[in-house]
Amino acid sequence: MAIKVIEEKCIGCSKCQKSCPFDAITIENKIAVIGDACTNCGTCIDVCPTEAILQEGTEKIVRDLSMYKGVWVFAEQREGKIMPVVFELLGEGKKLANEIGTELCAILCGSNVAELTDELFAYGADKVYLADAPELEKYTTDGYSKIINEAIGLYKPEIVLYGATHIGRDLAPCLAVKVNTGLTADCTKLEIDPDDKKIRQTRPAFGGNLMATIVCPGSRPQMSTVRPGVMDKAAYDPSQKGEVIKLDATFNEGDIRTKVLEIVKTTTDNISISDADFIVSGGMGLGKPEGFELLKQLADKLGGTVATSRACVDAGWADHAQQVGQTGTTVKPQIYFACGISGAIQHIAGMQDSDIIIAINKNENAPIFEVADYGIVGDLYKVIPAIIEELDKIGK
């Protein structure tokens, strides 16, 4: 593709030159000239008043959208264990499938993973597309994307959902490019438009300060990655059965360009905040980064982990992996302690579905108390030691 200027139409108005974000356009002898810095962004095409600029080599792909049916969930597994986010996607996928009157399917890749299909059926899948091959034992972008791309081309799903995990965030954009469709990343809400039956994908934007709803009107499949912990887990029914469709998982030399030499698991003793049943979270009300040591004492007593707010991450007090909120991780622990956290809407969105929320704050008017099940107005440096003392008394 290249940007071309039709000299006979160009009037040398310089609007394209002023609009170019890469300074790639000059005006020579009253004619626009496109330089090597051009990235084909197309901004100049939109502003040209005489339609003297066009993009060569582009053909609009017109798809028969009626050919695409079914909601697919990428059934991510690691070492023979299905990731928890898959069950959340099956729950949400079933709702979407019911609204548009189609079936819910899972696509499973791996080596010797056929026995996992029963678990996918139990969580609501009507069909499972299975690719089982030694080359798929460990995740590679080339291997997984080849198989799923071929399956999408053959079976034409209407919607494909992925967990916003490390693997999902790598695989989904690769497939979106391969099948020439759009992708909405890190969605926190999915719904079907009642009028046109397209999926409305909502995700945080501009640092979580607003929520953007995105649609994919002309391309299929519609693709989304969804954050773990956002959607409700599907109901489990072991009596549910379905159809297994085996995919061709044949690879030629050179299809997979990378080789996994070793998987080094984290050596940290901390529990992931997305998996923890008990979370003790601290905000700027701690007053100092050393305050997290006190929170860790309480978390250790409960067998939980420490989390934080975005403000503490921005201040360099804590790591982003510990951040709860729209721009961090969404969590659903049994108990969530909010210590010195004021309760910004972005943070609340990431923890409001916790079973029990306990807020500790000096400011009795802090917004966090509006969502808390129990609120303690006081100095956290006095309250938390008192809680630890009581836990010691009961043998915790």
UniProtKB/Swiss-Prot annotation:
A Gene Ontology biological process in which this protein takes part is: fatty acid beta-oxidation using acyl-CoA dehydrogenase
Q: Where does the secretion signal sit in this chain?
A: none
Necessary cofactors:
FAD; [4Fe-4S] cluster
Gene3D superfamilies per record: 3.30.70.20, HUPs (3.40.50.620), TPP-binding domain (3.40.50.1220)
**EC annotation from Swiss-Prot or TrEMBL:** 1.3.1.108
Major enzyme class: oxidoreductase
GO CC annotations? cytoplasm
Reaction(s) catalysed (UniProt annotation): hydrocaffeoyl-CoA + 2 reduced [2Fe-2S]-[ferredoxin] + 2 NAD(+) = (E)-caffeoyl-CoA + 2 oxidized [2Fe-2S]-[ferredoxin] + 2 NADH
Matching entries from InterPro entries are given as: 4Fe4S_Fe-S-bd (IPR017896), 4Fe4S_Fe_S_CS (IPR017900), DHS-like_NAD/FAD-binding_dom (IPR029035), ETF_a/b_N (IPR014730), ETF_a/FixB (IPR001308), ETF_alpha_N (IPR033947), ETF_asu_C (IPR014731), Rossmann-like_a/b/a_fold (IPR014729)
Q: Where does the protein end up?
A: Cytoplasm
Q: Name one GO molecular function term.
A: oxidoreductase activity, acting on the CH-CH group of donors, NAD or NADP as acceptor
Cofactor binding, note field? Binds 1 FAD per subunit.
- Transmembrane feature ranges: none
Self-association and partners:
Part of the homotrimeric caffeyl-CoA reductase-Etf complex composed of (R)-2-hydroxyisocaproyl-CoA dehydratase CarC, and the electron transfer flavoprotein (ETF) alpha (CarE) and beta (CarD) subunits.
Q: Which family does it belong to?
A: Belongs to the ETF alpha-subunit/FixB family.
Function field = Caffeyl-CoA reductase-Etf complex catalyzes the reduction of caffeyl-CoA to yield hydrocaffeyl-CoA. It couples the endergonic ferredoxin reduction with NADH as reductant to the exergonic reduction of caffeoyl-CoA with the same reductant. It uses the mechanism of electron bifurcation to overcome the steep energy barrier in ferredoxin reduction. The electron transfer flavoprotein (Etf) mediates the electron transfer between the different donors and acceptors.
PANTHER family documented for this protein: ELECTRON TRANSFER FLAVOPROTEIN ALPHA, ELECTRON TRANSFER FLAVOPROTEIN SUBUNIT ALPHA, MITOCHONDRIAL
- Report what the protein is called: Caffeyl-CoA reductase-Etf complex subunit CarE
Instruction: Tell me which species this is from.
Output: Acetobacterium woodii (strain ATCC 29683 / DSM 1030 / JCM 2381 / KCTC 1655 / WB1)
Q: What's the source species' lineage?
A: Bacteria, Bacillati, Bacillota, Clostridia, Eubacteriales
Gene (UniProt): carE
